[in-house]
């Protein structure tokens, strides 16, 4: 009997949880389909659902409901946070400069590039071998009074957790807006914005069991950003357009579940991750665990296999019934290593053999056992193929 496939790519996206689907479905049907800006009963019903969702997201992250601005996802929220902060600074006569780390999500790096296209500049902070941001470099950048600093809470490729409280505090002391991409943090690490000097924070639904196409930017100071799209007056004019009510309801429910279950899930996922790492090392002794020397979120395991190509590893894992992902990107026909691993100082040859295994709500010990069982044969096959092709 064929075994069901194993999904270990939860950092890319997650299945919609049944409770979340149940909560959002009424807002896609004749019950409460109205436009939340309409004054009639259909609109009022939709508005009630939207505002309840706003309250749920706020409770999950430690914010006020009025600070939650719904977006189409993490990428839009990141752009609103960075480009919006830069534009607001320019309107105040400030410095048009965005400071980011070298291991940010591509959405953050692209938004910083967009600030350059507006006539500003970007500063990219280095990280150490464990993926931690260089705080001395941060202090030097803050001395130039940039418009915004953006440092992700949990890295999406290796799971490294930044000292976000210290970083936010330094930005606040310097009078600089601080944004964090918390997409991989929500539901995985303790998150309470009331304890942080954080101006802006991004969250996304499809990483925690809600559907794709919904996220939020938590805006704790509306003066810190300017709108980057233009239209109606929805959401204080910061994000015009008719809100995705069903998506917002889904995000609210998913965020509530994720935070309620976080402590127990963190223990469970951390145990699964460590068991997976140990069993993989037993089968592939020279395997490298990336970011191992730093605090990591419980759901992400980044490994590098010497003498192997990540794309080949992923293809053969898929054939063996295991879904994982790579941090590398194909550009102009050439595979380049992950910018995150390169920034952390991993040799190019090793970085080209890196893959990410990410756990989620439905991951089980059986999944770990299955991956550990198939990995040695997959690695041997890929290494043999690389030798035949003259790549090692």
Regions found by a protein language model. Give the residues of each.
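Pyridoxal 5′-phosphate
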Residues: 1-392
């Amino acid at each position: 009997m064929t075994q069901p496939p194993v999904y270990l790519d939860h950092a890319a996206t997650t299945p919609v949880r049944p409770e979340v689907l149940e909560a959002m479905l009424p807002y896609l049907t004749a019950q409460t389909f109205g436009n939340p800006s309409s004054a009639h009963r259909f609109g009022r019903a939709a508005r009630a659902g939207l505002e309840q969702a706003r309250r749920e997201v706020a409770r999950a992250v430690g914010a006020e409901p009025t600070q939650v601005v719904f977006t189409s996802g993490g990428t839009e929220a990141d752009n609103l946070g960075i480009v919006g902060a830069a534009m607001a600074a320019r309107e105040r006569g400030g410095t048009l400069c965005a400071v980011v780390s070298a291991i940010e999500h591509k959405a953050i790096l692209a938004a910083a590039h967009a600030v350059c296209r507006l006539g500003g500049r970007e500063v990219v902070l280095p990280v150490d071998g464990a993926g931690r941001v260089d705080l001395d470099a941060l202090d030097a950048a803050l001395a130039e009074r940039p418009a915004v600093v953006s440092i992700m809470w949990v890295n999406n490729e290796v799971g490294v957790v930044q000292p976000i409280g210290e970083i936010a505090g330094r930005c606040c002391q310097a009078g600089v807006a601080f944004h964090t991409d918390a997409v991989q943090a929500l539901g995985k690490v303790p998150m309470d914005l009331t304890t942080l000097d954080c101006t802006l924070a991004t969250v996304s639904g499809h990483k925690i069991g809600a559907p794709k196409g919904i996220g939020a930017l938590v805006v704790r100071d509306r003066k810190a950003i300017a709108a980057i799209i233009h239209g109606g007056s929805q959401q204080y004019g910061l994000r015009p357009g008719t809100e995705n009510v069903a998506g917002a309801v889904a995000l609210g429910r998913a965020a509530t579940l994720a935070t309620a279950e976080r402590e127990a899930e963190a223990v469970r996922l951390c145990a699964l991750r460590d068991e997976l790492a140990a069993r993989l090392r037993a089968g592939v002794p020279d395997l490298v665990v990336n970011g191992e020397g730093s605090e990591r979120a419980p759901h992400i395991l980044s490994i590098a296999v010497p003498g192997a190509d990540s794309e080949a590893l992923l293809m053969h894992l898929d054939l063996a019934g295991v879904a994982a992902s790579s941090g590398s990107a194909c550009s102009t026909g050439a595979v380049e290593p992950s910018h995150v691993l390169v920034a952390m100082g991993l040799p190019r040859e090793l970085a080209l053999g890196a893959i990410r295994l990410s756990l989620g709500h439905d991951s089980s010990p059986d999944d770990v056992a299955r991956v550990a069982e198939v990995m040695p044969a997959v690695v041997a096959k890929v290494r043999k193929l690389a030798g035949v092709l003259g790549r090692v």
